[in-house]
Amino acid sequence: MRQFIISENTMQKTSFRNHQVKRFSSQRSTRRKPENQPTRVILFNKPYDVLPQFTDEAGRKTLKEFIPVQGVYAAGRLDRDSEGLLVLTNNGALQARLTQPGKRTGKIYYVQVEGIPTQDALEALRNGVTLNDGPTLPAGAELVDEPAWLWPRNPPIRERKSIPTSWLKITLYEGRNRQVRRMTAHVGFPTLRLIRYAMGDYSLDNLANGEWREATE
């Protein structure tokens, strides 16, 4: 299993809570970093029920309610019903490095599933499973304790009293639509809660849910 070393020097320690930012520029911005503009990297711990974008015609919660920074865009997606690390930047090359399939950038997820996965199920995840859009790459998959840093979700997950739950640490090297959820369902253990902890060299690193901070490239 590929190991990740997250450097504390990668990130600045100043964090911000900005839950009610009421103004955000509507001016269209290119995803290419303008010349002479320094690279900005924002790490955000996305709460549940927040879209990974700055606008939404349906009036749902978006990034603009939390991040008052213009000209940055999410590197990859993190679904509305998922939580955790979202990396935003104005640097297109960095976005590509984090998200393009050929780069094989590792992404670490902590996943609460229904039931207790068997060794056969874990081996299937590690070796790759065949989904409706083709076989997945081999992945890291291990049964772990509930993370000590875990925050309460609002609203809580729906649990069935007769069925236990457990936590997996899953490392992917690709990024298909709702891939983790589809993989755990494929081996018989549906995902109840999904938190992305790390993406390449960036991690949550004690960043509170709903907060953001600047990092270096």
Curated annotation (Swiss-Prot):
GO terms for molecular function: 23S rRNA pseudouridine(2457) synthase activity; RNA binding. The gene is rluE. Residues 19-28 have a biased composition (Polar residues). Its EC number is 5.4.99.20. Belongs to the pseudouridine synthase RsuA family. This is Ribosomal large subunit pseudouridine synthase E. The keyword DNA-binding does not apply. NCBIfam families: PRK11394.1, pseudouridine synthase. It catalyses: uridine(2457) in 23S rRNA = pseudouridine(2457) in 23S rRNA. Keywords: Isomerase, rRNA processing. Residues 19-38 are annotated as: Disordered. Responsible for synthesis of pseudouridine from uracil-2457 in 23S ribosomal RNA. GO terms for biological process: pseudouridine synthesis; rRNA processing. The keyword Iron does not apply. It comes from the Bacteria. The active site is at D79 (nucleophile). InterPro entries: PsdUridine_s_RsuA/RluB/E/F_cat (IPR042092), PsdUridine_synth_cat_dom_sf (IPR020103), PsdUridine_synth_RsuA/RluA (IPR006145), PsdUridine_synth_RsuA/RluB/E/F (IPR000748), PsdUridine_synth_RsuA/RluB_CS (IPR018496), RsuA_PseudoU_synthase (IPR050343), TruA/RsuA/RluB/E/F_N (IPR020094).
